[in-house]
Every structure is written in C-alpha cells, then in structure tokens.
Amino acid sequence: MARLKPLPQLWLISDARNDAALGHALAQMPRGGGFIFRHYHLPPAQRRARFDQLARLAGARGHLVALAGSRAEARRWGAELAYGPRGDLVPAHSLREIGRARNAIALLISPAFATRSHPGAKPLGPLRFRLLAARATVPVIALGGMNARTAQRLGWPSWAGIDAFLR
C-alpha cells in the first residue's frame, strides 16, 4: 500500500485481553499514533464490526490504522496498512525473519523485553534488540514488554504496546 504520511512512533496493538479498554486507550494515546487491529479471537463478522468501530475512533484521533491480514483484506476493510508476515508492518523475532521481510515498510522486532503475550519467551534485551535492528533496511518498531519506561531503557523512539496505554 502507498504511504501517504510518516509512520507514527507510538503504536497500540489490539488483543483479546485489552479489548474492553481500547476506546479509552485510543483516546489517551497522543494524536497521530498507530493502531494495529488483530482480534484473532473473534469470529469473522464480529471481528469486522469491532474493526469498524475501533477504526472510527482511531481515525477521529488521527491514528494510522493497520489490519492484521493481507494487503487486499486491509484495503477492503479501509485500513491504511496490513500487519503480518507478508504485510506492510512485519513482525520479526530473528535475523532470518528480518531477511524475509523484503516488502515491509517497517518491522516490529520482538520481544524486546519480557511480555505477557509470550510468557517464557527469552527477551532480546537492549543489546540484542539493537543488533537485530541494525540489520533492518526499514524503520523498526520495538515490541514486547514496551511502555514509556522500557522504551526509555531501550533508547528506541518507536515502539508498540498492548497494555502500555491502558492506564
């Protein structure tokens, strides 16, 4: 998909555990952030209805909206970007995955820190995160245990969180 504006530095990612607070979280984020709608837990019709509702809220705050799915699906649903292995925003956990993300406009490298999304997964930590990020040829968004405090510890300006904006 064509990029019309710069990528946001702050991103909110939807998840089953933060669904009830997403409206509040979208309102609390600084204007012009990014919102990645996943909601894999919902049946297709409910997922679409929830996307439409949250995309309206996100758009009212000037947030860029990405849909977890194919680029074609993202276009059909009215999202500005697609999130996923073959999307515009590509999650990456290793050098191999970074290399496979040839058509990405940005990478979400994770897990930067310990995260509730993947309990038991070994976090990269600041050094390994930066080593992976240095190999990327597109902008990198830190993911995994991210909030304002961990972003400062990582020393990385662009980050995404699931729980970070729920307070």
Label each PLM-derived region with a short phrase.
Residues 1-24:
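N-terminal amphipathic alpha-helix/helix-capping segment at the start of soluble metabolic enzymes
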Residues 7, 30-34, 62, 104, ...:
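A general structural motif
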Residues 7-8, 33-40, 46-47:
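Short Lys/Arg-rich amphipathic alpha-helical segments
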Residues 12, 37, 82-87, 106-123, ...:
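Glycine-rich phosphate-binding active-site loops on the catalytic face of alpha/beta enzymes
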Residues 20-21, 40-60, 69-77, 82-100, ...:
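Active-site-adjacent beta->alpha loops and helix N-cap segments on the catalytic face
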Residues 25-38, 76-79:
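Catalytic domains of carbohydrate-active enzymes, especially glycoside hydrolases
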Residues 28, 75, 99-103, 152-155:
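Non-catalytic positions within long, well-ordered alpha-helices that form the structural scaffold/packing
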